Amino acid sequence: MDAGANSLSGKVETRVTKGVLDSKYLSKMYEFASPMPKTSFNLKAETLLKGDIADTKAEFNSNIADIDIKSAKFTLKDGSIKSDYKLSVPDLDTLFFVTKRHIRGSLVADGDISKAKDLDLTFNSNIAKGKVAAKLHNDELLADVSSVSANAVLHMFFYPEIADASLNAKIDYNLAQSRGSMKAQVADAVFVKNQTFDLIKQYTKVDMYREHFNGDVSAKIDKESVLASVDLRSKEASIKTAATKLNTKTNKIDTDITLRAKKNEISGRLVGDIDSPKIVIDLEKFMKSEAGKKVEEKVNKVIEKEINKLFKKLF
């Protein structure tokens, strides 16, 4: 190997077997939310030296993730690097120390990365029965989500699997500030069994489970606080929320919600734990609807029946 300042020529082969990363040091250096687990690895790399460029092909295999690189070109003159990559994570939950949340499933992604004055990275993956294509420029992340299954996403993040739908979304997020926004289009949404839909079916004869909803979901993200709105519509019904407050750290929700089934409108409030929020119905509005009047008729009949029983006992 010749090693002149700008006239490198040769080949370097690197082999590491049964290596162990210094998890304690890395956790402190990168200020991970929780300690990085013990990570063992094997590394095989081959670097071709030509001029002022070192071109590396590498395979990194560990108990957390595997990374394959076909060509990582490092330019000695300006310290820039340009590389492809393929990332495989068999268990996303092992990345809790980075993601700060539990996630089910696995991940395979590929893309390119370059670092000179700026950092640029592309990311492509099949996730939750759909596709995600993202671009990172320094701290700015832009992502396009295509045909992702809502039910699969809810399952991944340990949220209640209340509905399934096809989602398309655009995400704009600043990693340094932990702030951003999301705009999503929902198609063919269907809901699982719940008490609210059961009551609507009982008093309005509208089967909300047979309805297929389409519409929009938007959200503004500020660290763990999310401010969202939902507007879903079907042939016979609609579901709307505005200023929905979610906290991903405490797992809490606080929102007003309006459900309409034909001419019947039910307004209420969801508050508490996302997994099992309390539901408070606006009875005044509900009683003015056709369904409310039917409930009132049934209640009156029950009261009348009980009064008649009482009078029969008295006389």
Where do the language-model regions lie?
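Beta-propeller and related beta-repeat scaffolds in trafficking/envelope systems
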Residues: 13-51, 72-116, 132-162, 185-226, ...
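Repeat-solenoid scaffold signature
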Residues: 156-174
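Outer-membrane beta-barrel pore domains and translocons
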Residues: 15, 61-63, 88, 126-128, ...
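Extended terminal
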Residues: 35-63, 74-76, 106, 112-118, ...
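Short beta-strand/loop motifs in extracellular/secreted proteins, especially
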Residues: 10, 130, 180
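Membrane-embedded beta-strand positions of outer-membrane beta-barrel proteins
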Residues: 12-14, 85, 123, 182-184, ...
